[in-house]
Regions:
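Walker B catalytic acidic pair
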Residues: 131
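Active-site-proximal or metal-binding-adjacent scaffold patches in catalytic folds
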Residues: 1-126, 135-170
């Protein structure tokens, strides 16, 4: 047998755990028809299963909360307000653990840590402005900071992020 499937509820969320003999190390989760499906290695202990199911539910809920923010509209409004270039793509990322945001100027793409969805809006706006400024000035030189400093809460937001352990995104 390749996979064993079990169902449970975690809080309000219905979860389906799929134990796969083909899966060796990784844990993956995705939503199917309102059910969070969590795939784990078949040899994983019940304690490890509980840990990873809880972790995947937390990640999914964090992603869901970030979906409530209309990111494209917010980025477009900030780009207009502060006269900064518009990106071709902007998305939330669950994989950004050491950065609040990142920008690839050559692709005109911006990624924002989904953790920002839980921070005050003015902090999110600062990180967006910071990343938008990279579309015009990739390096952290004086021209870059002149663009970022158009946002009136730059110093306050930088202080907030420093207190959280990370100063800026890149």
């Amino acid at each position: 047998m390749d996979a064993e499937v079990g169902a449970l509820n975690v809080g309000e969320m219905e979860v389906e755990v799929v134990r796969s003999s083909r899966r060796r190390k990784t844990v993956q989760a995705w939503e199917v028809g309102g059910v969070l499906r969590v795939a784990i290695p078949a040899r994983m202990s019940r304690a490890e299963e509980q840990h990873w199911v809880g972790e995947m539910v937390r990640r999914f809920e964090r992603r869901r909360s970030s979906d409530h923010i209309d990111l494209r509209a917010r980025v477009a409004a900030l780009a207009r307000r502060y006269e900064l270039p518009h990106p071709l793509s902007v998305e939330w990322s669950d994989r950004q653990r050491s950065l609040w945001g990142s920008c690839t100027p050559a692709l005109r793409s911006i990624r924002l840590s989904s953790r920002l969805a839980r921070e005050p809006g003015w902090v999110l706006d600062y990180v967006i402005v910071h990343e938008l400024a990279h579309l015009a000035e990739p390096a952290h030189g004086p021209e870059f900071w002149a663009l970022v400093n158009r946002y009136p809460r730059t110093e306050r937001a930088r202080g907030w992020l420093m207190a959280k352990g990370l100063e800026d995104g890149d």
